[in-house]
Design a protein with these regions (language model features):
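Acidic/polar, glycine-enriched structural segments that form the non-catalytic walls/loops
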Residues: 1-122, 142-145, 152-161
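Helix-terminus loop motifs that line ligand-binding clefts
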Residues: 95, 99-127, 134-205, 211-214, ...
Length: 225
């Protein structure tokens, strides 16, 4: 949407739209919605734009700047080497940009990748996605862990069922190497994945990290344990 414009974009085809104006400077707002969030994603996307336009660009920028000001104040490193320090801050930025919604960081590269927007797959998620979350709690970015941890909480019904298939009848979870966003154990029937269960203990350590750095006993008692 072009802010404060009386002209309407013209749809050329399903992949292209055009908007013509004599203005030299203008503001474009973009929203994204899918039928997972709303059965009518077009109207849902328009509603997001209406809310954003009503709030105004200046207020949106102020909110964004305030969020990042608080975020950057959470931690810092001083290593005496600009290159290494910048890697630390770059990773923090990548995680803040991609791990604040309902889902964890996009698998196999995250939100921003070196090869533009080329992504070989977005799901299933494999266990080695955990490496993106190593150290988040230690650097005081534990809030960014929530989408990752919630993904595994969604797996509980599927993991319980799989454990029973392997003979564990009560209070057992069996998590495979790969899974879908909704918790389905995608790797359980894959010949090259079905017997790889060691990732479960490594993933569990991230739940302990979250408790250890936050001291959230309710999380430990009611959810993780």
């Amino acid at each position: 949407r072009v802010v404060e414009s009386s002209e309407e974009p013209e749809t050329v085809n399903m992949r292209r739209a055009e908007w013509r104006t004599n203005k030299c400077k203008f503001t474009i707002m973009v929203s994204v919605a899918t039928d997972r969030e709303d059965k009518d994603p077009v109207n849902a996307a328009k509603k997001l734009l209406d809310e954003a336009e009503a709030k105004g660009v200046d207020e949106l920028r102020r909110e964004k700047d305030e969020w990042y000001r608080n975020f950057w104040s959470n931690s810092f490193v001083k290593l005496g080497d600009d290159y290494l320090e910048n890697i630390y801050y770059l990773h923090r930025y990548l995680m803040s940009a991609g791990s604040r919604g309902e889902f964890p960081l996009a698998f196999n590269g995250g939100l921003w990748r070196w090869n533009r927007d080329v992504l070989n797959w977005g799901t299933p998620h494999h266990w080695n996605q955990q490496q993106e979350y190593w150290g988040l709690c230690a650097q005081n970015d534990w809030r960014l862990m929530k989408p990752y941890l919630d993904t595994y909480f969604k797996m509980i019904p599927f993991a319980e069922k799989l454990a029973k298939e392997y003979g564990a009848e009560h209070d057992a979870l069996l998590i495979t190497e790969a899974h879908n966003f909704n918790g389905v154990q995608w790797g359980k029937d894959k010949r090259y994945l079905r017997n790889n269960f060691t990732p479960a203990s490594q993933i569990a350590s991230l739940f302990w990290d979250y408790y250890e750095f936050t001291g959230d006993e309710e999380f430990l008692k009611e959810r993780a344990y």
